[in-house]
Amino acid sequence: MYAILYQTIAKTQPASRLALICLLLIGVPALGGCGMELPAPPPDLFHKFNSIKTGLGPADLLSVDLNLDGHVDLVSANTLENSLTILLGKGDGVFKEPRTFKVAAEPTTLATGDVNGDGIPDLLTNARGAEQFTVLLGYGNGSFRKLPGVRTGKVPLAIIPGDFNGDGKLDAAVTLTFDKMEIFLGTGDGTFKKGDSYSTGSRSFSGITGDFDRDGNADIALAASSSNSSAIRLFEGNGDGTFSNPLAIAKNLVPLALIKQDMNSDGLPDLIFTSAQGDNMYLMIARGDGTFDKEIAFAGGGGPIALTAGHFNSDDQVDIAVANSRSSNFSLIVRKADGSFHY
């Protein structure tokens, strides 16, 4: 299996070049949005930079500086061989020989954060086939110490790290297949205590944290979709590790992947998500009180399944890249200087 690396070509600002990473799954569409037939990159914007070998069945890809050298490193969750592949970056788009770490059955999701408060990035991954999630404590050199698994309910899906009780220690929210979210409160040494559980209304593969109502407490937003119910579920945090009943927004739009980004420069985290309905991406502008303006739709490629924000051209505006699983390509939503968008 391979990860495909595209690099932006910013002729006027070469120092601001960003990499767009896509996963390639043999025989099936990739979660990262690239299929077997790689599309031609848009002229003067992207070129195919490299192909990087991973483990079997890569299902998620994470970029983070694991060894604190200022270069972006990559982590791949390999579902078919129950492992993580660590790729340490050299800073020029090239990576060192991969390192493999065995984890529990069927990792499909990755997250990062400082779990034990030593200032070094750690890794968290779910074990879909083992009803747990795994914490790997980083040493700061690209190596890790795997801790005993943290037990969860059946079929853990997304892992969403954040400080939910305001004690300065990293906590985690874990979504489950059967319409549930579990809260785990960090102790500061890499272990967790089980907190409350919440109904999500439907299955969620993607979630984020943010202070959406500006009360100083961490909130959680989930992209929750199933055959009979779908919405963005917004759980407002109480600051003690508990959450209020969720507010359902963007109902019936079948959200899949969800990110936050200030898209109109007002200092508030807006929501952007891909949808399984109509091959659309949606933008929701935050009002700062936990509510959002009506969704703005952007039509794009077939099967938008993943997205990321970044500066993909030479201006200073935030753009969005969307990976399309069915049409095996990616689309760009470019923000103009006047605040409007071009798809």
Task: Locate the predicted segments by residue.
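N-terminal secretory signal peptides that target proteins for export/translocation
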Residues: 1-15
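Hydrophobic beta-strand segments that make up the repeating blades of beta-propeller
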Residues: 74-77, 123-126, 172-175, 220-224, ...
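Glycine-aliphatic tripeptides that mark coil-to-beta-strand junctions in extracellular
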Residues: 70-72, 119-121, 168-170, 216-218, ...
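Beta-strand-rich domains and repeat architectures in extracellular enzymes and scaffolds
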Residues: 52-70, 74, 79
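Blade-edge motifs of beta-propeller repeat domains
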Residues: 34-56, 88-105, 137-154, 185-202, ...
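Bacterial N-terminal signal peptides
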Residues: 19-30
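Beta-propeller blade termini
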Residues: 59-68, 88, 108-117, 137, ...
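Short glycine/acidic-enriched loop and turn motifs that connect beta-strands
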Residues: 80-82, 129-131, 178-180, 225-229, ...
